[in-house]
From Swiss-Prot:
The keyword Nucleus does not apply. SUPFAM superfamilies: Nucleic acid-binding proteins. Gene3D superfamilies: Nucleic acid-binding proteins. Keywords: Methylation, Ribonucleoprotein, Ribosomal protein, RNA-binding, rRNA-binding, tRNA-binding. This is Small ribosomal subunit protein uS12.
Length: 124
C-alpha cells in the first residue's frame, strides 16, 4: 500500500485496456484475402468440424477467421470482410467473416436471423 507522500510524488499508474481484436486497428471491419480455407475441431467438451479461413488483412496482419452458417463458397484468394468476435471453443480464432459481403455469399434458405448471415428476405 502506498503512503500519502508516495502518491503525491508519483501518483497511481493508469492501466491500459488491451484490445481483443488488435488486427482491426480500431476499425469496425477489415478487408482481406483468404490464404487458406480449412476445418478444425473445437476444444474438449464439444465435437464438430468448424469452418475457418486464414486471412491476410489490408492492415498487414494474418489472422484466423470463423465462417458462420451452413455451407460457404470461400476458397483461396477469395476477398472477405472480417469483424471482431471470438469463437470460444476454437483457440486463436478471434474474428468472424461477414456473410453476404464481398466474395462471401450469404447462407442459402435462411429464414430466421437472416441479417447475421447475409440472407435476403424470401419472396412470399
Amino acid at each position: 500500500m502506498a503512503t500519502t507522500n508516495q502518491l503525491i510524488r508519483k501518483g497511481r499508474k493508469v492501466l491500459k485496456e488491451k484490445s481483443g481484436v488488435p488486427a482491426l486497428q480500431a476499425c469496425p471491419q477489415r478487408r482481406g484475402v483468404c490464404t487458406r480455407v480449412y476445418t478444425t475441431t473445437p476444444k474438449k467438451p464439444n465435437s464438430a468440424m468448424r469452418k475457418v479461413c486464414r486471412v491476410r488483412l489490408t492492415s498487414g496482419y494474418e489472422v484466423s477467421s470463423y465462417i458462420g452458417g451452413e455451407g460457404h463458397n470461400l476458397q483461396e484468394h477469395s476477398v472477405v470482410l472480417i469483424r471482431g468476435g471470438r469463437v470460444k471453443d476454437l483457440p486463436g480464432v478471434r474474428y468472424h467473416t461477414v456473410r453476404g459481403a464481398l466474395d462471401c455469399a450469404g447462407v442459402k434458405d435462411r429464414k430466421q436471423g437472416r441479417s447475421k448471415y447475409g440472407a435476403k428476405k424470401p419472396k412470399a
